[in-house]
């Protein structure tokens, strides 16, 4: 609309200038030299009265004033447009800086360079691949990331591969494990780099995100190495790739420094195909996600009979959520349904340990804007076999005594006869029930200082043939003070605590640490 007004204004000015020029030429032609004696046919058409000449001069002067006014109007319009463009660029930088991956929300997992925004939306992603059928509109690409140093002192100990995190499952499971106590640590593994793009098309907006960090896991656990976080795209209401699980709520993550985060929070990046039929005030999202599970063979872990058991995951996990966004915050309900199967591939005995179980879970989350300075972030989740979706994932499947277990009677056997073993396995696998919760408060003291404080817990309902030292309960607590002295920089101190309780041997362990972190962020947006 501003461009239309601008074009109309320019056209008006040009027309007025042409008209002024014509009138000026007419006056000059009439007043410069004495007119020749007109013929009788010209007398009626040629203005001889000086009043007519003065009237034309007055009209020219009025037109010149009009031109001056229109020039001022053009200057005002251009100034307004420049201010609007500057505001849009600032808003884009603020969204990118907070990375409310709402588009892609990446807390600490959240990429925050300023105090938390109580009204920050969640969203999908925010390509540069252009085809001739694209709708007219603005294309954009954002390059962003941060360099981050974590340093601190751990008063106890944990698994050395996870030296810069607080994970209750990685605390000692027996006396002397990971000894000795007390260590200073430093690392830059949280550092991150990402690219987002947005392209309008006739099918809706095409969005992509490609993001890496330096936090090694899996075979690279403990290393500072590149690790893929997101490789995901959306077109209209459909998305595909690796992105935050649809079973979780990224807005429930607090504004903390500790990398791994609350252990009882659903926090998982998974490969998926997603459909988002409703967005905005009320949202619905459905997805098919890559299945996966981990198993604990408990007191039978050393048995040869169990050596050939392999996961047999034939169906994807089905996840969904509904979300209600309001001025005071939001409420979200998420669900998961899937199947866990395992196959005994060892044919050397007569016992088949193959089995299956259902995995299912329900999660309720909420972000409440108590006021502009206080934001509450809450989650409660219950289910079975869903442990790998939790932030600090213990095992999904545990060994349980089989009540139908019997031995084949062998009262008489001739010499050299092959012994007959059990025909029904002594144990069966069962999906382990689990409950997790997280409750945090983000408080803004001023434009320069914020605090996050809260507690999280995960509790397993262990099966009766798990090992006595199996993980049962984990607890997590964090409190911090963060300082934002200038744009794109934050530093601060944080107290972190974690505790582990075992299943049956009464052993427990904990760790307390003080951490100081320095985050230097960058972002650059391009539009065309």
Placement of each model-derived feature along the sequence:
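Outer-membrane beta-barrel proteins
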Residues: 154-158, 219-221, 249-253, 293-298, ...
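Bacterial N-terminal signal peptides
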Residues: 11-22
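Bacterial N-terminal signal peptides that target proteins for export
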Residues: 2-13
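N-terminal periplasmic/intermembrane-space "pro-region" immediately following the signal or transit peptide
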Residues: 27-162, 528
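Outer membrane beta-barrel
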Residues: 128-297, 312-330, 367-382, 386-388
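Detector for outer-membrane/organellar transmembrane beta-barrel domains
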Residues: 326-471, 528
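Outer-membrane beta-barrel "beta-signal"
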Residues: 509-528
């Amino acid at each position: 609309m501003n461009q239309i007004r601008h074009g109309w204004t320019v056209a008006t000015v040009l027309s007025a200038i042409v008209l002024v020029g014509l009138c000026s030429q007419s006056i000059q032609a009439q007043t410069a030299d004495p007119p020749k004696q007109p013929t009788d046919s010209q007398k009626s058409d040629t203005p001889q009265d000086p009043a007519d000449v003065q009237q034309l001069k007055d009209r020219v002067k009025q037109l010149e004033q009009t031109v001056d006014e229109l020039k001022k109007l053009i200057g005002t319009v251009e100034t307004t447009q420049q201010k609007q463009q500057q505001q849009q660029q600032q808003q884009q930088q603020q969204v990118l800086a907070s990375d409310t991956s709402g588009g892609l929300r990446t807390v600490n997992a959240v990429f925050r360079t300023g105090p938390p925004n109580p009204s920050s939306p969640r969203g999908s992603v925010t390509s540069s691949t252009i085809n001739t059928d694209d709708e007219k509109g603005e294309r954009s690409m954002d390059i962003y990331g941060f360099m981050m140093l974590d340093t601190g002192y751990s008063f106890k100990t944990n698994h050395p591969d996870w030296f810069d995190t607080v994970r209750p499952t990685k605390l000692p499971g027996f006396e002397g494990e990971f000894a000795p106590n007390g260590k200073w640590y430093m690392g830059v593994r949280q550092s991150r780099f990402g690219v987002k793009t947005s392209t309008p098309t006739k099918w809706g907006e095409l969005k992509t995100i490609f993001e890496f960090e330096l936090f090694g896991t899996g075979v690279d656990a403990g290393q500072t190495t590149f690790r893929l976080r997101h490789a995901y795209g959306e077109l209209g209401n459909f998305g595909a790739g690796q992105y935050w699980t649809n079973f979780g709520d990224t807005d429930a993550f607090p504004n903390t420094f500790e990398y791994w985060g609350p252990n009882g929070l659903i926090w998982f990046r998974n490969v998926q195909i997603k459909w988002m039929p409703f967005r905005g005030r009320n949202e619905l999202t459905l997805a098919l996600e890559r299945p996966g599970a981990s198993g604990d063979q408990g007191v039978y872990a050393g048995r040869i009979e169990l050596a050939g058991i392999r996961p047999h995951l034939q169906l994807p996990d089905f996840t969904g959520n509904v979300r209600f966004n309001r001025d005071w915050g939001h409420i979200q309900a998420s669900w998961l349904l899937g199947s866990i199967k395992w196959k005994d591939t060892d044919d050397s005995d007569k016992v088949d340990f193959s089995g299956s179980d259902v995995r299912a879970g329900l999660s309720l989350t909420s972000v409440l804007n108590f006021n502009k300075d206080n934001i509450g972030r809450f989650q409660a989740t219950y289910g079975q076999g869903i442990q790998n979706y939790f932030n600090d994932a213990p095992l999904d499947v545990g060994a349980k005594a089989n009540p139908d277990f019997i031995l084949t009677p062998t009262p008489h056997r001739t010499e050299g006869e092959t012994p007959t073993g059990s025909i029904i396995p002594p144990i069966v696998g069962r999906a382990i029930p689990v409950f997790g919760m997280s409750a945090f408060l983000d408080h803004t003291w001023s434009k320069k200082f914020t605090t996050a404080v809260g507690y999280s817990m995960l509790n397993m309902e262990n099966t009766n043939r798990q090992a006595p030292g199996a993980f049962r309960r984990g607890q997590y607590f964090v409190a911090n003070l963060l300082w934002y002295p200038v744009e794109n920089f934050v530093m601060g101190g944080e107290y972190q605590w974690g505790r582990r309780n075992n299943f049956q041997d009464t052993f427990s362990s904990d760790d307390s640490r003080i951490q100081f972190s320095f985050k230097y962020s960058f972002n650059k947006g391009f539009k065309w």
